[in-house]
Amino acid sequence: MHALLRRVTRGNGFYIGDLFHAAAGHDATTPVTLDQPLQYAPELGTRFTVGQLAEQTDELAARLWAAGVRPTERVALYKKDNFDIALHACAAARIGAVPALLSPALEAPVVRTLLDRLDGPWLLTDATTLAGPLGTVLAPASVRAVLLTTGTPAEGALPAAGATGPAREGDAPPPAPVVRLADHRGAPKRPPVFLHPRQPSLITHSSGTTGVPKLAVHCPEAGWHRLVPQKVVSWPIRGKEKAALCMTFVHSRFYQGLAMFLSHGNPMLIAVDPDPSRIGPLFARERPGYIETHPNTYVDWEALADAPGEPLAGVRVFGATFDAMHPRTIQRMLGASRRTRPLFVQFYGQSEIGPMAGRWYTRRSAARMNGRCVGLPLPGFISLRVVDDAGKRLRGGRTGHLEVRSRTRILTYLGEDQRYAEQLHDGWWRVGDMGRRDRWGLLHLLDREVDRIGDLESSLAVEDLLMSRLEELREVVLVPGADGEPVPVVATVDESPLDAARWQRATSDLPTMAPVRQFRFEDLPRTSTRKIQKPELARLIQGVRATDQGVGA
């Protein structure tokens, strides 16, 4: 079936360089509102049309071409968090370059490692970022040139273009030149370049929950196959509801979400800052009918359910595509909407594959939901099986490794082809999660393979229960202790001490665990999508075990 559909749909591609132009071709007046001005052009304000954003994409593409960027060349983007990350990525893709999106949350040494894997890319950043830790880790030959979106090179950071002088025999490689893109303002407009559908067109990185992130190489064809089922699901609200996206601009999901609603002609609201104190008034003013953010951000947005102005009252559909959501959070989101029949649509996926399974919830079904059930594999796009350690398919109801076959898979891990190949078994991709299928074919996600703790069937299920039983929890995760025992780590909504008696009652019927550890929420190690880095947290727990002050068993 997959081979047949691949032949039928061959030649289709998803090109982020054409996002705003394609939307403008349908209706150039469709509004797009930002929560913050563009960093490189704050004078333009926060209200645009898709036609104006297409013009901005053309302007930035012309600047990149004038600076020397050419088709198939890699452009690493690592800068202050702002929607202009997306615009510069679209601009690079517009001229056929390959944007490599690096999260602003990554530490400079990790960025240096990823730049080395990118093998001498152009580096697009801003002067403030360059003058910070990034400038101290850049090796002379680690990048082809530095392209500044704003500001000028800080004195002593890196020399300006042409300031290095003639090379002499035996000299070390000269530092990379620094180019201000603003110096190429008004450069001639360039025609679009569309790479082959199976050619690398975008590079993103994995969450990095287990260490240095992997660089995922995407192609237009796989992106197109990811987008099709999402456009089908969003069809009922096409052109009607204002769609609000608040997620990292360095994940492929953002561009899929953008394309999904731009192609439908929906007005859009794009936010950088997820803080409830700021996103609440924004939603109360703009009244989105669709919102999507990271699962952990939704937990913070539970505070919006009772916020002044009822910021979630107009939401018809809540969307989530990164990880399984806590039932408590879904219930509170749906309860905060004043629409007649609001829905929470949840997809389970990963960077390497995109959405793999999905389902939706109403207020009634959410009240009795099982947080580990992530729905049915997407028919026609995803084939999913559960296998044992030897790769043998397991019957329904048995727990094993999840593997998928699809047309949505990335091409490789850049610089780690062998690591990529090790996850393929006769065309089946080892997802890295443990789960099972029930009698109806529904997928139940139990744990990441690397996060399994002893004989505990599912640490995620325990976390769901604790979040539902203790409304004061903002975060709870289970990690292995020094002796392999489950250690619960929590953070509370207001950083108040966890009540030992309430914890005891909430855990009385759960598997035996070590004493609970309470952290400040901001001290928990996280990824760019706000997921907890469990291996790092486990190392932290084990390293400070001797000074632990537990709350209770």
Curated annotation (Swiss-Prot):
- What is one GO biological process annotated to this record? antibiotic biosynthetic process
Query: Which keywords describe this protein according to UniProt?
Result: Antibiotic biosynthesis, ATP-binding, Ligase, Nucleotide-binding
Compositional bias (Low complexity) spans?
Answer: 157-167
Which residues belong to the signal peptide in this entry? Answer: none
Pfam families, per the entry? AMP-binding (PF00501)
The main enzyme category here is ligase
Region (Disordered) residue spans: 157-178
GO: which molecular function terms? ATP binding; ligase activity
**EC annotation from Swiss-Prot or TrEMBL:** 6.7.1.1
Q: Which family does it belong to?
A: Belongs to the ATP-dependent AMP-binding enzyme family.
This protein is called what? 3-amino-2-hydroxy-4-methoxybenzoate diazotase
